[in-house]
Each structure stands twice: as C-alpha cells, then as structure tokens.
Amino acid sequence: ACLSPHFEKVSYVSVSGNHSRIDTKERALMQERLDDLVEWYLSARMQSFENVEIGYGKRIDSSMYVVDVRGKLYVGIHGDYDPSPAHIQALQTMVGAPVYAVLIGHKHHNATDIVQGIRTIMAGSFMGMDDFCVQKRIFGKPEQMVCVCNSDGIDCFYDVALCPVE
C-alpha cells in the first residue's frame, strides 16, 4: 500500500501452494488451501487504492494463472505439481498459447533457466527454510526475485536478499 503511489499500476496475483493445506497431503482437496484467504483479505484492504488490482490475469485453476506483461504471456505456478522441466510444455498446452516465461516458487531459492525455449524464473521464499526444508536438507535463504520487463520480455532480474526472521 505504501509503495502504490510510486507506480502507475500495481497488480497482485497468487497461486495456492503446498504449505497451506488444511488436511494431510494425501487427503487435502486442491481447493481447500489457506492461500485463498490472502487474496480475499488483500481485496478487502486495498479496495480504496485505484491503481491496485488484486487477482489480475486469467486463473486456470487455484494452482496456475496467466498474465500478460507488455505483450508476453507469463504463467505463474507454485511448482509442487510441476517437478520436472518436462512439465513446461504441458503448461503451455494448458494455456493454449505461446508462453514466454513460467514463474515458480516451490524450491525456496532464486534461479533462472530456459527450458524448451521458455524462460523459467524461480523466486525464493520470504522466510527461507521451513520445517520441510530442514527435514529434507533443502537449503534456502530468505530471498525474492525482481524482474524488470519490457516488450521484448525480461530485460533484467535482481536477486533480493531479505533479512532472516529471528
């Protein structure tokens, strides 16, 4: 909210991930995730900000969205349903149009790659490692990825280190 005056337009989208299941992994329903509360809450709190849009883009399902950024299609996923590069082509098929980039969060660290001609941008976690990461010995520092986009796609990206929560 405090940054919105510095931008012409602020768009917020999110997908559900594997950290907010209400029941165990085996019994959880895809549509029963606490992530949905974030978008609902932000919509209510930000309704008076004319340049802030919550839920921008086209939602394929609760785990996938598509947004147009300066004429390029970006697909957002958490990543827990898409564990290998082979799934990139499946995502493009689901969208039904050429995809420029896939935005992913699942693995708790920043990374970029090009898979089957599609750029992949993986953003880290605000908190770094959680209990699951510790148990599986997956390392991740608190970090995020910022992409600067133009009509050609991603012009540059920045790794943003965050302060760990004590």
Where in this protein do the model-derived segments appear?
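Core catalytic region of metal-dependent phosphoesterases/phosphodiesterases
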Residues: 1-49
